[in-house]
Amino acid sequence: MKTSMQRKLDQLSVRLAELNDLLSRENVTADLDQYRKLTREHAELGPVVEQYALWRQSRNDEAAAQELLADASMRDFAEEAIRSARERMTRLEGELQKMLLPKDPNDDRNIFLEIRAGTGGDESALFAGDLLRMYLRYAERQRWQVEMMSESPSDLGGYKEVIVRIAGQGAYSRLKFESGGHRVQRVPATETQGRIHTSACTVAVMPEADEIGEVEINPADLRIDTFRASGAGGQHINKTDSAVRVTHIPTGIVVECQDDRSQHKNKDRALKVLAARIKDKQYHEQHAKEAATRKSLIGSGDRSERIRTYNFPQGRMTDHRINLTLYRLEALMDGDLDELIGALVSEHQAELLASLGDAD
């Protein structure tokens, strides 16, 4: 184990002992906010220090076995004990490295998932609908809650644009690598010659902003227009101006919501999506310089980057960032995404570990 990593773990062990002392005091609950902070920190440090204690025990076991090597009658036993201790140390060190990785502050947040049809006309809109179904089925498997925020249906089915809110533990940490261009290759239902068409959609995954004060929006910077909601094909679906369009003048970001019959609810939803888009824009601007110096294959979230191809005739899905091809497209489109998402998370962790190694 690197000296820098061991030093960090020693510091965390000392801090955990301090927390144990603080939490055992009689007046610890006098300040509930402080008490919650201490218990949260204790919960985060406990598993790390526990793993480190196991690593140190394995190191001590190896040292004890080394002393037995001089005794010929104990040599076989000692060599086996050394091998076993080193295997445990290697495994525990790998787990500790992952535990010490810097945490994305957005990982525990709910998300807004936005899917837009791109090149390919009606077929692209149909594929946007298929992608939405894929994510909704995955959310169902995770027992997450889903709320439709805004939808713009296309004439033949599917969506020109759709935004849903997904709420649940780990929503952003599991889906944040879905941002980017998704390409589909298949024979459209409207194709009479059996030719394979290529079309594309873009996906954006945005962490939900906190209710209070995280994104400051000056009401003077907003232009709010109301209009009659319309369905596919442009037909009006109610006779009141319940649909709301919010424009954030400084950034040019526009959000429309028309799914509810209540203008107030549509406005509230539009402002929530707007806050998430502004937060997302700020996040990407903040990380632009960092991305330029160290190109991250997984975590860039660049909407213009083609990240994945879905080839229906061959029944395969290829993620171009990690060169992963899975020949079980039907299951993937039905929301069975654990293998794919797990591979992306693992690759991202490997990138972070490599960058930490470069820094040492």
From Swiss-Prot:
Gene Ontology terms for molecular function: translation release factor activity, codon specific
Name of encoding gene: prfA
Gene3D superfamilies per record: 3.30.160.20, 3.30.70.1660, 6.10.140.1950
Top-rank lineage group of the source organism: Bacteria
Free-text description of this protein's post-translational modifications in UniProt: Methylated by PrmC. Methylation increases the termination efficiency of RF1.
Modified residues (N5-methylglutamine): Q235
Function field: Peptide chain release factor 1 directs the termination of translation in response to the peptide chain termination codons UAG and UAA.
NCBIfam families per the UniProt record, alphabetical: prfA (TIGR00019), PRK00591.1 (NF001859)
InterPro entries: PCRF, Pep_chain_release_fac_I, Pep_chain_release_fac_I_sf, Prokaryotic/Mito_RF, RF-1
Gene Ontology CC entries for this record: cytoplasm
Protein name: Peptide chain release factor 1
Organism of origin: Burkholderia vietnamiensis (strain G4 / LMG 22486)
UniProt record similarity statement: Belongs to the prokaryotic/mitochondrial release factor family.
Cellular localization per UniProt: Cytoplasm
Keywords: Cytoplasm, Methylation, Protein biosynthesis
UniProt cross-references to PROSITE patterns, sorted A to Z: RF_PROK_I
